Design a protein with these regions (language model features):
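Ubiquitin-like/PB1-type beta-grasp interaction modules and other compact soluble beta-rich domains
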Residues: 1-64
Length: 65
């Protein structure tokens, strides 16, 4: 299935979970994730099934002064 992650198209197997997509991308903590503009708590990554055309945003914190 096709999903967009940070505006880049990826093909994932049907039934893929968010946790597997993050592992495949080697995402480094800390970060937050939103799917279709909906924040997903870290505790739900393993249960969150992805669907065709999902828009996933991986957001890393920015520090500054």
């Amino acid at each position: 299935m096709r999903v967009m992650i940070n505006q880049v198209e990826y093909l994932l197997p049907e039934g893929a979970k968010l946790e597997h997509a993050l592992e495949a991308l080697q995402a480094q903590h800390p970060f937050a994730v939103a799917i279709n503009l909906q924040f997903i708590p870290k505790s739900n990554y393993g249960q969150c099934a992805l669907a065709e055309n999902d828009q996933i945003e991986i957001i890393s914190p920015v520090t500054g002064g």
